[in-house]
Swiss-Prot record:
Origin species: Drosophila virilis (Fruit fly)
Zinc finger annotations (SIAH-type) as residue ranges: 125-185
Name this polypeptide is given: E3 ubiquitin-protein ligase sina
Pfam families found in the cross-reference section: Sina_RING, Sina_TRAF, Sina_ZnF
Gene Ontology CC terms, in alphabetical order: cytoplasm; nucleus
Chain spans, region SBD: 122-314
Compartments reported by the entry: Cytoplasm; Nucleus
Region: Disordered, residue numbers: 27-55
Annotated residues for binding of Zn(2+) 2: 160, 167, 179, 184
GO biological process, one term: regulation of R7 cell differentiation
Amino acid sequence: MSNKINPKRREPTVAAAVAAATAVVATNTSSSTGSSAGNTSSANTSSSSSSSLSSAGGGDAGMSADLTSLFECPVCFDYVLPPILQCSSGHLVCVSCRSKLTCCPTCRGPLANIRNLAMEEVASNVKFPCKHSGYGCTASLVYTEKTEHEETCECRPYLCPCPGASCKWQGPLDLVMQHLMMSHKSITTLQGEDIVFLATDINLPGAVDWVMMQSCFGHHFMLVLEKQEKYDGHQQFFAIVQLIGSRKEAENFVYRLELNGNRRRLTWEAMPRSIHEGVASAIHNSDCLVFDTSIAQLFADNGNLGINVTISLV
């Protein structure tokens, strides 16, 4: 049996939101009229408006909290944000869930492309909590700022940065290193801003990853060397450094990778990636040190490749 949500719970919710939006508009109109009539009239209007808001939700904070709950999607419990569409009975569902549904999850009626302008007006006057509030974020934002904030929120959960491990772990930034040390014990950590990253057996067939940690300046950096087959028989190496930290922290550093030997030198210098961003997109766009197997053989010694890594403060 499917868990059908009682439609009666949503209908008064939308009605309450419309009433609240009307109250807000009425309050603004009354305040404007009272102001033009004089100070005494303005004071009376202000008192009346304050009383009205208080009864609606216990003041501005209470009202905002009450209204926010009206925007919960009945499927995923995230917020339904503008543009807001409703079914023919007035029930709401978020855009993400709507694309996966064939009928309204509340009344099982047909989904319709009907804009709910009243709810959109309410949404423009409500502040929504960050979706990472469970990880400690206390920000409250208008809906137009919500997505941008959440993409760079310092409290957002981080994915495991270890490439090729298919690790499903995610958690707060301050637990990333603990996870790596407990679950990926094979990763070696070297101290200092100048180290040699030694990748062994680079002639192994297929896609291979080499990973090492570097600790300096009070931070940890993950050094990654990936070998991929880009197209038939043509293999390439991609070397990159990412900071176990935020994007803002990464802006304080620059890393330098250098292959050196046999009177040849190949270098790359850039700002480290944050684990917010990961390394996949940088590798896909070749925004890192890139060289093919023939270049690798010029610097390799018995199948082993040493990469000099230098981390510097900007």
